[in-house]
């Protein structure tokens, strides 16, 4: 897995690590029982104080992060990965603001989703309840530590964090700060725990701790996500690789399309909602492509183009390979192709998209509706940047990840997605009878 550095060197060390992870999971399960009944006022005050503590102790966080960044550079991490790793005053303030926003959101726990009174007078309600213990496996993005803690705690869950060794110092300080505040509020210190990050086995022990961990959520590159989903015996939510497309339709406004393309690709290249593919309708290619290639060049983006894109020319254009269409670059690269029609664009996305975010730029309402209906993705943007697929932009305050699967959760995962449901039945001495045939009317009962 991409979060690892080495495997345990001996069987004894492996068993020791396994017990360390399982012991943390057992403590988290106990903490989750207390968090499940914490009231909203307690949880909101906790998040506000966590936010204040992050800002107050920012120098401590930055000092630890500087060491991680220096070690990353020495280890040869690419600048895009260094950007993900880096924390500064502005990013810490952003994390704090995210916590405050989450505090201001409705508490999902106890929300009544539906209810009815049966003909026999039995009152039924389906309500939201916490998931329990949530495991998060993620790479070198220390902001995930804070986002995950804030969201899971607000939803009444305990969280086990398994970050990357590249962010170990940053994550350790962040969890220490958050835990200090948790304890100050009289909640269990084990509500937020950081697992060992130097052995891949710690991931394996976490994602197979069935009965202790209720769900595991991987956040990172394709290798990490597929490894967790394939090996987990704990239920896993697949947060997807972002092979996102921007399709410029025949009836697009060129200036609007350029603005959306540049924002989708170049605003921040190392995030999963960055555009990795550009599709251009052939009827607008002659007008749009020269300007698009020029502006992408100015933004430092290399274009991996099909034959028609290469013919359009430019110092930043190289021929695309078959692999380019399926690549999540997370860098200053984009694949680009000219398509003959909207259906051809949809077919290309079906063949190569990851189900994350797809965008169309068009002034044709019918084309927008067709694209929206036919493209299968967690989010479809009409005349808007792919960068908007984000928990903060969607009003969630933060997100635990962006799910590309269809069960339980899809798209940015906020507070409701960190809950399950429970049925409550209120009776008055009700007992179940039998059906007209003299046997239970429900085959299962």
UniProtKB/Swiss-Prot annotation:
The lineage of its organism: Bacteria, Bacillati, Actinomycetota, Actinomycetes, Pseudonocardiales. One of its GO terms (biological process) is L-proline biosynthetic process. GO terms for cellular component: cytoplasm. It catalyses: L-glutamate 5-semialdehyde + phosphate + NADP(+) = L-glutamyl 5-phosphate + NADPH + H(+). The gene is proA. This is Gamma-glutamyl phosphate reductase. It comes from Saccharopolyspora erythraea (strain ATCC 11635 / DSM 40517 / JCM 4748 / NBRC 13426 / NCIMB 8594 / NRRL 2338). The keyword rRNA-binding does not apply. Belongs to the gamma-glutamyl phosphate reductase family. Keywords: Amino-acid biosynthesis, Cytoplasm, NADP, Oxidoreductase, Proline biosynthesis.
